[in-house]
Amino acid sequence: MTIYEYTNKGCREENQDYICHGSIPDDGYICVLTDGMGGYSSGNEAAKTVAESIREYIQDNYSKIDMPNIINEAITYSNDELMLKRLSIGSKRMGCVIALLVIAKEYAYINWLGD
C-alpha cells in the first residue's frame, strides 16, 4: 500500500501534526493522524505519543473478531501513555485530536476524537 502524507503548519509557529502508519496481520493496515492542541504545552510530543501508542496497541493486539473494541482500547491506552508522558516532562496540560483508519479484511474502520 502506498501512503502519501502532507501536513501544513498554517499560521502557527510550530507544526504539531503527526502521522504514523503500519501493517497489521491479514494484509491489513493502520494509519493514525494526530494534531497537538496549540493552546496546550508540548502539543507536538502529545501528538507523537498518542499516534505511536495507538498504532503499537493495535498492531500488538490485533483481532479479526472485535476490531471496534480493540480501537477503543487503543485510544484509552494512548490516553494513559499521554498522562505518563505529561508527568515525566512536568507539563500541566497536554492533548491532541485523533483521526485513524484501520483496514482489516474487507472492512475499513474509521474513528476520530476531537474537532
State the predicted function of each range:
Residues M1-G114:
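PP2C/PPM-type serine/threonine phosphatase catalytic domain
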